[in-house]
């Protein structure tokens, strides 16, 4: 059996990374052992509340259901047991909420995308909210290391009567370690389909050539922490005005609009701390006025 390097091999020293993670003679991520993990979660409802109808998991992804309110299922937590994502890895997550299910899906910790040789890491997330289900996709941040390569896609399917809140956020470089991106590739796609019709498509891309120009105001204006949040439900106007009212008080740039029957908000901050603080503030206020549901700060964010 081929031995898998532990996460401790991914140190701050790039030369150490190459020595430990790359076998002699390999010049591509294809020559290395890579992860192909996936999970599927299907949720419905019963007299007791949300029920788990089906769960599938393939290493290195694990799915946990911490019980925080007696026997009720309110939160699903995804764990990447490999400790991070490397070039050539492929990870897929599928979540479907049906009937009157109410669930928040988050991650145990921030996801780390390590430096790659040539191949991109591929991360695909598919979210489906049907009937009168309420689904919140609230993972913790994704930290993109210097010279990492990431292709990520978020596909969402919603139907009239359902309610959904989805968030994805990126940290470009390990700013807490003083690291800044000098090169790297990030491709981030969103596709949202409502009642079988595409209502919103968005693509964000960073290449090696773009990284040196982050300081430009037309690009990121030196912001290294960015996020996109999307809401669909019956309280569109109220949620839109709430975020607009909060925006001036946040420790980051924030813009929000109503498009395609969705509330779409963008956030950009100079530090991960500022962005996390802003998102916590928005989520704490966002659920106010809505029926009891998953649209709050996940408990795992405080662990």
Task: Give the residues covered by each predicted segment.
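Short, structured patches in soluble enzyme cores that scaffold and shape functional sites
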Residues: 97-99, 107-109, 129-131, 139-141, ...
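N-terminal intrinsically disordered, cationic/polar leader segments
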Residues: 2-6, 28-38, 42-58, 130-137, ...
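Structural motif
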Residues: 102-104, 134-136, 163-165, 227-228, ...
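N-terminal, charged/glycine-rich beta-strand/loop interface patches
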Residues: 2-141, 146, 153
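Preference for bulky hydrophobic residues occupying beta-strand positions
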Residues: 41, 93-95, 127, 156, ...
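A short, polar/proline- and glycine-enriched secondary-structure boundary/capping micro-motif
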Residues: 62-65, 114-120, 147-149, 175-179, ...
